[in-house]
Swiss-Prot record:
Belongs to the CWC24 family. A zinc finger (C3H1-type) spans 138-166. The lineage of its organism: Eukaryota, Fungi, Dikarya, Ascomycota, Saccharomycotina. Gene3D superfamilies: Zinc finger, CCCH-type, Zinc/RING finger domain, C3HC4 (zinc finger). SUPFAM superfamilies: CCCH zinc finger (SSF90229), RING/U-box (SSF57850). PANTHER family: RING FINGER PROTEIN 113B, ZINC FINGER PROTEIN 183. Involved in pre-mRNA splicing. It comes from Saccharomyces cerevisiae (strain ATCC 204508 / S288c) (Baker's yeast). This is Pre-mRNA-splicing factor CWC24. Its main location: nucleus. It is found in: Nucleus. Disulfide bonds: none annotated. Residues 1-67 are annotated as: Disordered. It comes from the Eukaryota.
Length: 259
């Protein structure tokens, strides 16, 4: 504990005491400038009921303008490439934020180009990271055209192009032909169950087979001989009027069996 000493105060001590005043930190008050004090005084006058107009004098306006000019003198402006890029990025961010506020958030990504126009792109499909596929499209196979069409090339072995007469087909075309062959084979097998395996007139294999309107098959020569006797079918005795169609399906099946 400290005790106060009672000392006769002189005039010089009183002056020093005035200079060294205690500051109470519990009462936090902001120190106002002269201009703010003047404005606060004017506001207090207005609250008290005085009808004087609150206007800043020309001197105060001049002081404020001078201060603004002084601040402009000491502002630092750098026009480098780095600052330009930062400004561009800042403008882009502002445009993106404005666009997000205007439009509701969707699953689609929002992309902004340099002009600030909005472009919507579909969401990128997530692909597996452990698999990468590379596709090579050979639009110029370098095959000798003369040799492929005719089997002869004037350059002979010195020709720089490939001498090949193979026919290449795309995958979709091969699948289409495969499906067509399957359908044809199914149709043929269904019909063969009803078709006799030999001609009913000559009891031999079919030669240039024909089919009547009633669906019966005969050899072309056998059917012509039978039509001399009568125009009715030999099996079902229906009227054929002496006409018959070429059985192309049966002929294809017979050719496949021979081959």
């Amino acid at each position: 504990m400290f005790r106060k000493r009672l000392v006769n105060k002189s005039s010089s001590d009183e002056k020093n005491q005035k200079k060294r005043q205690k500051i109470n930190f519990s009462e936090e008050k902001l120190v106002a400038s002269d201009e703010e004090k003047g404005s606060s005084d004017l506001m207090s006058l207005a609250k008290s009921g005085n009808s004087r107009t609150l206007q800043l004098s020309h001197e105060n306006e001049g002081k404020l303008q001078k201060k603004g000019e002084d601040l402009d003198k000491y502002t630092l402006t750098v026009n480098d490439d780095s600052t330009k890029e930062d400004l561009l990025n800042f403008e882009r961010k502002e445009l993106a934020e404005k666009a997000k506020k205007r439009r509701p958030s969707d699953d689609n990504e929002l992309v902004l180009n340099m002009s600030g126009k909005n472009k919507r792109l579909t969401k990128q499909i997530n692909q597996p990271t452990n698999i990468r596929t590379t596709v090579l499209m050979d639009f110029q196979p370098d095959v000798c055209k003369d040799y492929k069409q005719t089997g002869y090339c004037g350059y002979g072995d010195s020709c720089k192009f490939l001498h090949s007469r193979d026919d290449f087909k795309t995958g979709w075309k091969l699948n289409q032909e495969w499906n067509a062959d399957k359908e044809d084979s199914k149709a043929v097998t269904l019909d063969l169950e009803k078709i006799p395996f030999k001609c009913t007139l000559c009891k031999e294999d079919y030669k240039s087979p024909v089919v009547t309107n009633c669906g019966h098959y005969f050899c072309g020569s056998c059917f012509a001989k039978d039509m001399k006797k009568g125009t009715k079918c030999f099996i079902c005795h229906k009227e054929t009027h002496g006409s018959a169609k070429v059985a192309s399906d049966l002929q294809k099946m017979l050719n496949k069996r021979k081959s």
